[in-house]
Structure formats: structure tokens, C-alpha cells
Design a protein with these regions (language model features):
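Structured, non-membrane catalytic/scaffold regions adjacent to prosthetic-group chemistry
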Residues: 5-163
Length: 163
């Protein structure tokens, strides 16, 4: 395997956004529930993975999120009386943003090649993908919420749940 770097705008595998039409190349499904699928090897030849081919690794079923306005979403900070306890999506979007090129790899990538065999999803080489990610650094969010610099641990909770 090698990396053939090209400009993102020159990337073409006849890939379309999910839901807009057929693709020549698709994710390789290992599990439907929870959703686990790996990037096809042909897409690993490029520096940026097309969004529809970004590998999927979920430990639990996808959460069921009720239909509501995005204006109703908040990040809530719990556990300290000296902080602004929440920030809404509008305020979050107003914070400075950073764009980074990031490669994400599951620790189980190439598990199929391990000898002796081990349990878990039997990934070949496709539990890795690269993309440009844009967002507000967590440090800026926590500063906006007046979190003390003495805090050493943060627990994140989301809408997903499992056993």
C-alpha cells in the first residue's frame, strides 16, 4: 500500500454524496447493527477520503434523535458552579474555527492479518480514512464557558447508549 497524493479538487472515483445516486465504489460492510464498514482499498490511494467512503466504526446502534430545530441544541457543562453552564449552537458557530487535515484509524485496522486470530471486527486495511475537518477547538469552547484551568478531567456524553 502506498499513498498517491493529489489535490482534493482533482479527486475523482465517480463518487457522489450519499443518497444522490449510485457509486462505482462502496464501503465494505462488516456489520449493519451496529454499523461497521471499511473504506475500499482503491480509495486509500489518495490523500483525502471521499465522505461517502469514510470508514464507519460504531459500538452501539445509531441514536434516534427527535426532529427539532438546531436552535434547540446546547452543549451543557455540569459539575462546577463557576462556569457558564451551557452554550447554544448559534454561539458555538460564532467562535473561531480551525481546519485540519486529519487521518483517523481504528485500533483494529488489519485485524484480519493478526496471527493467531483475535476477536473483534475483522478489518482488512480499510479502517482508516483522511479528511479535512473544520470546527472550533475544544479549548475555545471551554474558555467561552469559563472552565477553570485547574480542571484535569472531562467526561463527554452523547445521545448514543449501549450495554
Amino acid at each position: 500500500m502506498y499513498c498517491k497524493c493529489i489535490r482534493a479538487e482533482d479527486f475523482d472515483l465517480n463518487i457522489h454524496d450519499q443518497g444522490t445516486g449510485p457509486t462505482k465504489t462502496k464501503l465494505k460492510s462488516l456489520s449493519q447493527n451496529p454499523l461497521v464498514a471499511e473504506t475500499p482499498e482503491s480509495a486509500l490511494l489518495y490523500s483525502i477520503t471521499p465522505n461517502p467512503l469514510y470508514f464507519q466504526r460504531n459500538h452501539f446502534p445509531l441514536p434516534s434523535i427527535p426532529n427539532s430545530s438546531l436552535d434547540d441544541w446546547n452543549i451543557v457543562l455540569d459539575g462546577s458552579s463557576d462556569v457558564n453552564d451551557q452554550i447554544n449552537l448559534k454561539d458555538l458557530k460564532a467562535l473561531p474555527k480551525t481546519t485540519l487535515s486529519v487521518t483517523t484509524e481504528c485500533a483494529g485496522n488489519n485485524r484480519l492479518d493478526v496471527s493467531p486470530p483475535v476477536s473483534g471486527n475483522q478489518f482488512e486495511s480499510g479502517a482508516v480514512s483522511s479528511a479535512y475537518w473544520t470546527g472550533t477547538p475544544l479549548s475555545a469552547v471551554l474558555t467561552k464557558m469559563n472552565l477553570s484551568s485547574d480542571v484535569v478531567e472531562i467526561l463527554f456524553e452523547g445521545a448514543d447508549d449501549g450495554i
